[in-house]
């Protein structure tokens, strides 16, 4: 005997399946952007800062310098790839300087372009200025194309780093846990690490917290002077002197 399911049952089954698919997609998005667990202890990590780009809009640095804002430094996006300069870079640097907030700059590293040309783009934009904290290189899969081998990515990143070092800059490497294990660990251990992580300890191979310089612990912070979410960071005290007392080789 053939059993014919009522249309209402079929619709209910389809609705359940769709709900499960939507829930799974939502969980993936939540995990990428919003799932944040550990928070740094304020007494252990008192020096806090943010990183910004044009996507953060018009930043009111006068508000950021207020004691209640709890912003002790700011990283400003400078360049990306071989020819892109963030439209807000110059003005953000000027405003940070006027507000007396220590400002570093960062370069978004592209997997698909030459490392030396990327270094030239960053160096030209910095114009020979010294920054404390020092320049950072943002290394992550997000925003980069697929299809590049680990060896090629590391080779291009090394070219970029070597060019900066040759000009007297001692850069940091910004990355997440996956990027650290795949690209940075064992290749750039001599450079200060800026790790993006939502767990404690921030770096799973560093339970004593002696190998990371900056910890980005949130993508959705709220601070005075910025409309919308902003990345939040803390400095590891054992790296504070190295980061904020000049980085150009003598």
Residue ranges and their predicted role:
Residues 37-57, 61-62, 188, 193-250:
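Functionally critical loop-and-helix segments that line ligand-binding/catalytic clefts
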Residues 32-37, 41-59, 66, 76-161, ...:
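Substrate-binding cleft of extracellular glycoside hydrolase catalytic domains
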Residues 164-181:
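Aromatic-lined carbohydrate-recognition surfaces of secreted/lumenal glycan-active proteins
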Residues 114, 179-188:
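Glycine-rich, charge-decorated loop segments at or immediately adjacent to ligand/cofactor-binding or catalytic sites
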Residues 10-30:
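Hydrophobic membrane-insertion alpha-helices, especially the h-region
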Residues 1-9:
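N-terminal Lys/Arg-rich, disordered targeting/topogenic segments
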Residues 98-101, 179, 250:
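Catalytic-site microenvironment of enzymes
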């Amino acid at each position: 005997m053939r059993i014919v399911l009522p249309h209402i049952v079929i619709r209910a089954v389809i609705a359940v399946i769709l709900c499960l698919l939507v829930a799974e997609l939502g969980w993936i998005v939540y995990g990428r952007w919003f799932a944040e667990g550990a928070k740094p202890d304020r007494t252990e990590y008192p020096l806090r800062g943010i990183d910004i780009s044009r996507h953060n809009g018009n930043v009111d640095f006068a508000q950021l310098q207020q004691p209640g804002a709890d912003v002790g430094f700011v990283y400003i996006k400078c360049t990306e790839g071989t020819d892109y300069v963030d439209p807000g870079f110059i003005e953000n640097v000027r405003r940070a300087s006027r507000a007396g907030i220590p400002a570093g700059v960062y370069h978004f590293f592209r997997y698909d372009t030459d490392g030396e040309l990327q270094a030239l783009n960053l160096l030209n934009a910095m114009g020979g200025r010294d920054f404390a904290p020092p320049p950072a290189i943002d290394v992550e899969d997000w925003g980069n194309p697929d299809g590049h081998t680990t060896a090629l990515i590391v080779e291009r990143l090394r070219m970029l780093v070597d060019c900066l070092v040759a000009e007297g800059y001692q850069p940091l490497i910004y990355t997440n846990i996956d990027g650290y294990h795949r690209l940075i660990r064992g290749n750039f251990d001599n450079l200060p690490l800026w790790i993006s992580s939502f767990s404690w300890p921030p770096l799973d191979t560093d339970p004593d917290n002696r190998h990371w310089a900056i910890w980005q612990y949130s993508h959705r912070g709220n601070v005075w002077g910025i409309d919308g979410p902003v990345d939040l960071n803390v400095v590891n005290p054992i790296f504070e002197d190295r980061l904020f007392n000049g980085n150009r080789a003598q």
